[in-house]
C-alpha cells in the first residue's frame, strides 16, 4: 500500500536482508526510485531479477554501503592506485566478531508481539512459527533471513579492495570453516579468493589472492598489538610496503 502512494518519489529499503529484493521490486514496479541498503539481495537469482527490473523500468537506483562515502576509504584508494606501496601482491580482510554458529531453536509456543505482523516480516520465506530469536539483530545468524558475518559485514570491508583494485568476479574461491549447517551461518570462516589480472587507472595489475577471515584473527599477518589497535580491517601487501585500514583510519607499514 505504501508504494502505491502517488506522492512518493523514492523508497529506501533498510529491512532485514531476506526482504530487500521483494521490497525493491515492489517499489520499482510502482514507478518509484530505490535506494537499497547492502547487501542488495540474498541470492544470485534475486540479484538478477532486481537488476533486470531496474533496466526495464529505468528507475534511479543505488545500493547503500555507508562507509564508502567517507574520506578515509577514498584516501586509501588514492594511495593504492598511485603506487604508494608498489604492485599489490595480496590482500587480507578480517572481522574479529561473528554472527552465526547457532543451533536451530526448539519450537515452543511463543506469542507474536502485538506490534509485529509476523507474516509480513517473513515475506518470501516459507511459513514458520514465530520465535524472538529470529527477529531484531539475531536474524543475521540464519540462512533464511541473512548470511552471517560475511554477508553482513563483509560488504563494508570488502568494498575497499574491490574499489581500490577494481576487482570483479573471482576466478576461484576456497572456503574453510566448521561443518556446514543447513540453518545457521558459520561462526568462523576463512575464504581465499583468486582474482584475475586487470587494468586499473591505465596500469596493468597482475592476478592476486584476497583472503577473508571472520571469527578468528589472522595471526600470521599481524601482531597481537596490531590486532588490538585495529580490530577489524584490511591489509594491502605491496611490493614496496603495506597499507592497513579500517573504517576510520589507515597507516602505511614497512
Question: Which residues does each PLM region occupy?
Answer:
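Alpha-helix C-terminal capping/helix-to-coil transition sites in glycosyltransferase folds
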Residues: 5-7
Amino acid at each position: 500500500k505504501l508504494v502505491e502512494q502517488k506522492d512518493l518519489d523514492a523508497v529506501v529499503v533498510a529491512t532485514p536482508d531476506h526482504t530487500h529484493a521483494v521490497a525493491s521490486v515492489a517499489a520499482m514496479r510502482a514507478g518509484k526510485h530505490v535506494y537499497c541498503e547492502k547487501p542488495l539481495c540474498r541470492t544470485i537469482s534475486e540479484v538478477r531479477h532486481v537488476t533486470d527490473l531496474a533496466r526495464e523500468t529505468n528507475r534511479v537506483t543505488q545500493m547503500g554501503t555507508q562507509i564508502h562515502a567517507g574520506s578515509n576509504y577514498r584516501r586509501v584508494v588514492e594511495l593504492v592506485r598511485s603506487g604508494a606501496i608498489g604492485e599489490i601482491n595480496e590482500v587480507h580482510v578480517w572481522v574479529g566478531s561473528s554472527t552465526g554458529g547457532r543451533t536451530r531453536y526448539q519450537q515452543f509456543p511463543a506469542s507474536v508481539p502485538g506490534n509485529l505482523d509476523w507474516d509480513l516480516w517473513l515475506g518470501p520465506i516459507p511459513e514458520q512459527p514465530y520465535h524472538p530469536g529470529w527477529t531484531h539483530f539475531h536474524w543475521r545468524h540464519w540462512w533464511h533471513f541473512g548470511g552471517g558475518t560475511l554477508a553482513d559485514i563483509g560488504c563494508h570491508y570488502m568494498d575497499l579492495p574491490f574499489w581500490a583494485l577494481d576487482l570483479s568476479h573471482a576466478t576461484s574461491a576456497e572456503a574453510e570453516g566448521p561443518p556446514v549447517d543447513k540453518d545457521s551461518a558459520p561462526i568462523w570462516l576463512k575464504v581465499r579468493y583468486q582474482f584475475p589480472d586487470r587494468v586499473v587507472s591505465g596500469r596493468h595489475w597482475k592476478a592476486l589472492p584476497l583472503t577473508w577471515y571472520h571469527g578468528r584473527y589472522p595471526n600470521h599477518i599481524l601482531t597481537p598489538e596490531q590486532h588490538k589497535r585495529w580490530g577489524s580491517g584490511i591489509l594491502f601487501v605491496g611490493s614496496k610496503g603495506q597499507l592497513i585500514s579500517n573504517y576510520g583510519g589507515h597507516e602505511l607499514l614497512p
